[in-house]
């Protein structure tokens, strides 16, 4: 394809395909944290020497992650449609398993799952999405820009959800650890690689 500021069409298809792959994993991960939440929250509460009755997760936890699953399915559908519009399809290219590897790594610790999936991987998306959107804008691909903008705005709420429930779990734990300390400890323990900038501070906040 012809190369311009937005790269070749082939490179843009590859980028959309990679993003669709991430969204497909994200659908499963939203339902996974719904299903694992009750058992892992009990384990979280028992990780202290202090006796405290089990606190069931509030309904809002389940509502938040069910909404996230619906959002991720919408995102996958938007990206899949753009691939078809551009003469490709999801499954046409190889995919990577980084997100799923992190899910497996954090499968027994709810705070680790929230930290790594939602506050590292999804927050990283907030950093790179604007650059991706500009690449498609430079290529004159307004439909992809619209889809990617919709996805970006939803992902801001997903990072907020991860932050909200990590903060909640720290607050209800008998020892009330600092969410920042818990996050940093989980990144050191469970995340392979370095957190590299640039960071999109406005959307992260």
What are these regions (language model features)?
Residues 1-205:
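Non-heme di-metal
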